[in-house]
Amino acid sequence: MSDHSPISNKENHLLPSDSSRSSSSDMHSTGTTGTTGVEPVDFTGEGAKYTTATEGNGGADLAIQRTTTMNSAAESEVNITRRLTKILTGSVNEPDRVEVDYTNCAPMGGDRPYPPSLPSRDLYEVTFDGPNDPLHPFNWPMKKKVLLCLVLCLDSIAIAMCSSIFASAVPQICEIYHVIEVVAILGITLFVLGFAASPVIYAPLSELYGRKGVLVLSAFGFALFQFAVATAENLQTIFICRFFGGFIGAAPMAVVPAAFADMFDTNVRGKAIALFSLGVFVGPILSPVMGSYIAQRTTWRWLEYVVGCFASAVFVAIVLFFEETHHPTILVNKAKQMRKQSNNWGIHAAHEDVELSIKDIVQKTVTRPIIMLFVEPLLLFVTIYNSFVYGILYLLLEAYPLVFVEGYGFTENGELPYIALIIGMMVCAAFIWYMDNDYLKRCRAKGKLVPEARLYAMVIAGTVFPIGILWFCWTGYYPHKIHWMVPTVGGAFIGFGLMGIFLPCLNYIIESYLLLAASAVAANTFMRSAFGACFPLFAGYMFRGMGIGWAGLLLGLFAAAMIPVPLLFLKYGESIRKKSKYAYAA
């Protein structure tokens, strides 16, 4: 589970929709809130109504300062943890069984009668222990969170780097296996297709069974397949192993943002997601720079060996240092430990009550990201914009060598201009970090989460992005007249636009679908990666056939046409979320 509350005096508290005022008052007695004038706000999630208790704007400043401990207090309520489990397992509409019924049960055996009913299960159900429970990820020491973030970011960088480092192997693959360039590029396409497909499986599984198990499995399989590619004897094996390396290794693309949402409240979440976004974009851009040096001095196989060694180190780091962040799974582990220590088998967590068959898992959870993508207009249109931008990133992997190697005659170090892209991304990340303060001010003003306020930075970046594309492509179109530094500087503007569109999109999706953040991000990753897989296939033909300048004009016009997307969501986003079946807050 993740931070699940619009900002109020002490963070919003998720209550079942049938909760009465008296139950709300009981909750107040736990210390989660202690003032009057509470107004309920309804929102929907997975087909059922929920209620959040929010305060007036007067307490909003206090909320910004004290949100870290409030969700722990809210999750100390049995009804809340039980409701959250129903959301994550897709069993919201299934009634709670409150009476013992032995009608269809097998005999106890030994001619024994059926046992009497147990006391209320609420007495045996574990929750978090108030606002300062050290088990709750919001209350973990910052040093611990930083370490976990470092491990998660390295995991994300490993998979992102591997997606594009194969571009440095393409010339050798063409020469050794006697294939044309578009066939060799399939090594990139199949890998990205692999990590387009699997996050829609990994994300729901992480919401059922926790983040760590999914990440460990993914990191281990990813490392193995990198060594398999490096030792492959033929092209078919290379391509098959590249696909499965991407498929198995893609868990970080959906699970890492959800893990960040598990650990950080509204004050810090946006800044933490910025680190993940840098890894997602800097990895594919930095890897050709590194890959060109490796490929020029050794063979293409060492590209895969290097990634495999890096992935192995990340796997060890996850096993040794990563701690489970998924809130319901933490309570499951707490219940297991208490049962072992006390020998009281009745102690349990709400997440253990739901038993799902393979069929249930597929129908209720694994299909959820795809269903969300196509029934949620908010998620669909933001994802289309995000996917187009991500596809541009992989187009640039083809355009840069055409401009700087074929145009300007760079023989070695032809990938160094990529660094301008990275500089632009870092500048944009710093800008969005600054804009996060503006976002928190808007939350204070409304007294709740305002996901649309994340999009103001995207309006600016969306304008800079087509300018950067046109700058880079048209100045790079005349290498004999214009110095190579001019298109290089244009690349910095492209980098600013890439990061400035991707990061607000990701934050917007997470905060709009907070309880189902992993599934929403997986849906986004599915389409985004599909674009990233397809774009390189036609990149060379487009840039060579149309010319760098005219191809850039086409891309720039597409990018300019999408500038209104964040403006539309700024105006209509809140009303769309109110009608949503899955959105968190309205």
From Swiss-Prot:
Residues in coiled coil: none
One Pfam family this sequence matches: MFS_1
Membrane association type: Multi-pass membrane protein
Keyword flag Membrane: yes
Parts of the chain that traverse the membrane: 146-166, 182-202, 213-233, 243-263, 272-292, 302-322, 377-397, 415-435, 455-475, 484-504, 506-526, 529-549, 550-570
Cytoplasmic side: 1-145, 203-212, 264-271, 323-376, 436-454, 505, 571-586
Gene Ontology CC: one annotated term: plasma membrane
Outcome, altering residue 207 to Q: Loss of function
Subcellular location: Cell membrane
Further remarks about this protein from its record: Present with 1470 molecules/cell in log phase SD medium.
UniProt name for this protein: Polyamine transporter 1
Species name: Saccharomyces cerevisiae (strain ATCC 204508 / S288c) (Baker's yeast)
